Amino acid sequence: MSQEIAVVGSPEFTTGFRLAGVRKFENIPDDEKDERLDDAVERTLDDEGTGIIVMHTDDLDHLSRGTREAVEGSIEPVLVTLGGSGAGSGGLRDQIKRAIGIDLMEEDD
């Protein structure tokens, strides 16, 4: 079964992905994230047709502890965060390591 990319976030964040052909998205206006973001992320996690969830790094702060732990620990679908500059923006290397369990860029001494 083929899986798709899903984007969760503000309309401004999801628009570029939609224009690029991403069909699965959850638009949550900034002023409603505290109330609605958990439900949107949980729906996306439960969707068997989704293989990758894309979110803005800053949006993780709006998630409840349980939802945040679920999405960060999920292997399928895997979470990819973009943007932001906080401590939680560990980069693509850490996201790949978390998703597959090994560090592909580890250097041998």
Curated annotation (Swiss-Prot):
Topology relative to the membrane, per the entry? Peripheral membrane protein
Q: Which residue spans traverse the membrane?
A: none
GO CC entries: plasma membrane
Q: What main location does UniProt list?
A: membrane
Q: Which UniProt keywords apply?
A: ATP synthesis, Cell membrane, Hydrogen ion transport, Ion transport, Membrane, Transport
GO terms for molecular function, please? ATP binding; proton-transporting ATP synthase activity, rotational mechanism; proton-transporting ATPase activity, rotational mechanism
Q: Name one GO biological process term.
A: proton motive force-driven plasma membrane ATP synthesis
The protein's matches in InterPro entries, at most eight in alphabetical order, are given as: ATPase_V1-cplx_f_g_su, ATPase_V1-cplx_fsu_bac/arc, ATPase_V1_fsu_sf
- By its UniProt entry, which Pfam families does this protein fall under? ATP-synt_F (PF01990)
| Compartments (UniProt record) | Cell membrane
Q: Does the keyword field hold Acyltransferase?
A: no
The reply on keyword Cell membrane is yes
As for what it does, the entry says: Component of the A-type ATP synthase that produces ATP from ADP in the presence of a proton gradient across the membrane.
Q: Family assignment?
A: Belongs to the V-ATPase F subunit family.
What the entry lists under NCBIfam families is as follows:
PRK02228.1 (NF002577)
Describe, as the record does, how this protein assembles with itself and its partners: Has multiple subunits with at least A(3), B(3), C, D, E, F, H, I and proteolipid K(x).
- Tell me the protein's name: A-type ATP synthase subunit F
